[in-house]
């Protein structure tokens, strides 16, 4: 197939520096060698914060989100003193599932008291339905994104310290939402849930914990969770720099683990999201995405099971396995040296090589498209495969 490439540069709009930017080690910081290409963005960030404030002030005041006909009540409390780099956010999904609303409401109330982080916002959403998949409906993802946006703007949350956890049906939700929204989370922990055949490759850059009682035999949860711990072991054996995980099949415990799983909270807190990992593995799940970390694909080609692998080494981006006709690569000065040419290769062939010109308009476009302070990019390369 003939290979062509397109380099997109947009210019207009003077802008300022992003808060909570992360270096390649996953910790908040900057790359002094490329600061010339990271001007102070507070004007753009301020515009974004204002837009979120306008859109979500009703949710902050009323403790309920609404998208279309769906409503998601949200409850939160704040623990500890706010760190200099912003609060953590723990999104904790309740049990229940295919039952009546009152039982799911009871499980939501129970979840509010289940875990106590030493620091951060502990937030429990009430699922939008009363179905077995109540936490990972196709409509759910947009609610989780809005929870994060609201928490960043109204509660001083650091978007690189957002954690996902859930028990029973909430654990079912974590199994699905952790990989398909992996670029949003700093770490995730699944408690007493069933994976329902989910693929795990997209967890490459997301620390992930699995908890299940050894006697939790309903739906073979104990056996399947042990199997999935083995799957993560195998993925990490093939890729030792990725797939940080820990699995616990708790001896003598059934579906209720008597609080043993609370150890997940300090474990997750050790990690901060790195929005710019050097290597990305992306497998589309039941809810398909157009963007993942610093990659973009044609929306019409985003189908369940489609794979994309890419990595950055110095100023070279290598595209590996790819089920798309084209790929968009979003870059900033924390990822590559923008003073030098950038190269994109695939199967040993150079698809693009050239010096990139940062675009203020692209920064704005990507920020308001992704609605994440870390995903405002000044440069983009699109290559056709």
Q: Which residues does each predicted region cover?
A:
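Active-site machinery of serine-nucleophile hydrolases
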Residues: 86-152
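A domain-start/cap signature at the N-terminus of enzymes
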Residues: 22-88, 352, 357-378, 382-385
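Alpha/beta-hydrolase-fold serine-hydrolase catalytic core, especially in secreted/extracellular enzymes
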Residues: 29-35, 73, 233-385
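Primarily recognizes the serine-hydrolase "nucleophile elbow" in alpha/beta-hydrolase
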Residues: 160-204
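The feature captures the conserved acid-bearing segment of alpha/beta-hydrolase catalytic domains
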Residues: 187-269
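Acidic beta-to-alpha connecting loop that harbors the catalytic carboxylate
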Residues: 96, 127-128, 214-217, 252-253, ...
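Gly/Ser-rich "nucleophile elbow"/oxyanion-hole loop immediately N-terminal to the catalytic nucleophile
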Residues: 80-85, 132-168, 180, 184
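Bacterial N-terminal signal peptides
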Residues: 8-17
